[in-house]
Amino acid sequence: MDRRGLLTGLSALGVVACSRPGPSAAASAVPEAFDLSALEARDGGRLGFVAHDLGSGRELVWRGEERFVYCSTFKMFLAAATLLRVQAGEERLERMIPVAATDMVPHAPVTGPAVGGALSVEALMQATVEVSDNPAANLLLAAMGGLEPMRAFYRGLGDADTRVDRFEPEMNRLDGDKDTTRPLNGAANLKRLLVDADTPLSDAHKALLLRWMIETPTGPARIRAGVPAGWTVAHKTGTGGYGPTNDIGVLYPPAGAPVILAAYHHGARETPPARNEAVIAEATRLALSELGRA
């Protein structure tokens, strides 16, 4: 689909249009404590959670200031940073980047078959957002000059807390505060890029990023499992092999303003992955019920 067709299609869903909130929705929310301790106790993990209703302005928060390893949720922000480079004339969507055997790290569903050839910048972004391809993320980081430009990207959003310390897959390994964020930062960054009227992303590039986030097949048992039928979910998952199970995104109802949601669950190492995912789904259901959006 071309850029114009993509933008038209997302507008028809109400995704682009309802990403332009009125003054009341754009106002700063006052965080409300949203006690999820019972949910944590049931599965023995630690959950950081934010649900921001852009219609009412209510923002439900649990452990919003605590740090969590973000894992692959960062990849949608990496794509956004790359799109801003395209807008600035520093990068081109169609530029081909060689893919070598030495670039390979675990989880390479798109780049693995491309070894010895090349993929476009756009294809690498799509791969890293839709199917969380790790070499694609590293190639995009290298293309922008390493980790410092990503740090600058977050600072440009007003986020001085999110850490960017390592490449894939090392960034998924718990090591103090390295490669961590706070749930309130994750939610605020989503709002700044995908909802605010003065987002730095152009309409076409925002629509492109949203399409990848909507079409991703990852994490169907996380946020998606907790929303009512008929809602559109644009999200990005992140998973560590020792318990971290994350999902962040924007939830678009059939009518009305969207809800921003950021969930970072650090489950116990021995907890089955399905149970860790169910925690996020249940927290989503509880939040939407509390907000009167269920």
Task: Locate each region found by the language model.
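N-terminal secretory signal peptides
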Residues: 1, 12-14
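Structured C-terminal helix/loop/strand segments within mature extracytoplasmic catalytic/sensor domains
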Residues: 2-8, 21-36, 143, 194-220, ...
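Beta-lactamase-like hydrolase cores
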Residues: 22-69
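Active-site SXXK
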Residues: 57, 69-97, 261
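Short, glycine/proline-biased beta-turn/loop segments that scaffold the active-site neighborhood
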Residues: 88-113
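Conserved catalytic neighborhood of penicillin-recognizing serine enzymes
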Residues: 104-139, 147
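Mid-domain, small-residue-enriched loop/turn segments at the edges of structured enzyme/sensor domains
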Residues: 138-197
